[in-house]
Amino acid sequence: MINGYKVAALCVSEIQNENTQSMIAPLYQSLLEKNWRCLLFNTTTDLFRDTAFDRGEASIFQLMDFSVIDVVLIYTQCLKCRAIVEDILTAAQKHRKPVFLIEPTERYSGGIRISFDEADAFRYLVKHLIEQHHVTKFACIAGFKGNPASEIREMIFRDVLKEHGVPFDEKWFGYGNFYSIPTQEVMERFLADPEGLPQAIVCINDSMAITVCEILEERGIRVPEDVIVTGFDGIVQEQYNFPRLTTCRRNLDRFGSFLSKLIERANAGEEMKREYVFPYTLDVSESCGCRKFSMKAVGLAVNSIYSRMNNSAQYDRSMTNMLTKLTFEQDVEKVNEILRYYIRSDTYLCMNAGFFHGDQNGHTYETEPFTEEVTSLRFFTGRKTPKSRRFRSGSWCRTGTTLPKEQTLWSFMPCTISRWCMVIW
């Protein structure tokens, strides 16, 4: 806690990834409404390879100041190094802080697990096609053979058909391996059948459903008038597919509210279960015919895509310009002058004492990644050179005394050179 505000530490990777952002933003807003503040600790890679560079990146998590942090959340779906997750868990448990593991794919030594239940929503989807659209002839495109998620959804699909007395011909089953090219091969087989297509094609994920819609469109087969197509996941790409898919998705606004309530309970010292489950939601839409196609929605989607492409192009241009200017520059003062055009004025660049003198020996993830005292540079608007100051590395959060007063997500990100870590916050 700082100045009366409770503080949650969010441990993630690749915040530049839209899926990660979509998980963080609703929770952050929900916690703000409950008078919390958040610190985001992010790595630019998912740490899967666990290389020396990855370990340098992971040093960012050793900056967590547990004297001010009340609760820790670890997004294990994007942090893919078990050892690093266990290190965060150990540090938090040492300070008796509650830890939430968001969507864990394996068992860890502690923490409160937050999982998602897909089964009910997918069951409702298949029942919806039978009970509301009176489908009696189905095709199903699954993911990988042996994949647990795919096999569970396939089992649910078959169970619902059996419960409703709907026969299923195995010739209408195939593995699309969760992506486009294998799905195309399955669809070519379906389209070659002399009987013609069934009434509905149930896909185990949205990516395969989008591919199916594209192939049917190319053949002049209308969705949903001629064939119903459904997906599962609610991926970002689905927002730009027309017709919009009937699918199952996570309602992340509700999830943010659900999780923030659990965080408050854990922080209050309530006895918590080892695992909590949040359900997926059935979203009936255009590809089954429950919602009408809208040209207005198409126009909005096209404009959104253009804006995203334009923002991406501007970002690429800025990064290229910065790298071109910095590549062969060795004068520290000139480096600082260049950086001020590319770094926000509310950003600090922090590094170990002696960094510019090459004195980094021993400061790695396994030892002490940060010196007792660090140097920070802040790039104020209108100044050619940054303002420099020094402070103790163990008090980063307390140094930012304006943190609780501002409804801003304070982010700590590594700038890693080889296995040594600088920090941008």
Predicted regions and their residues:
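Bacterial carbohydrate/catabolite-sensing allosteric modules
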Residues: 1-333, 340-345, 352
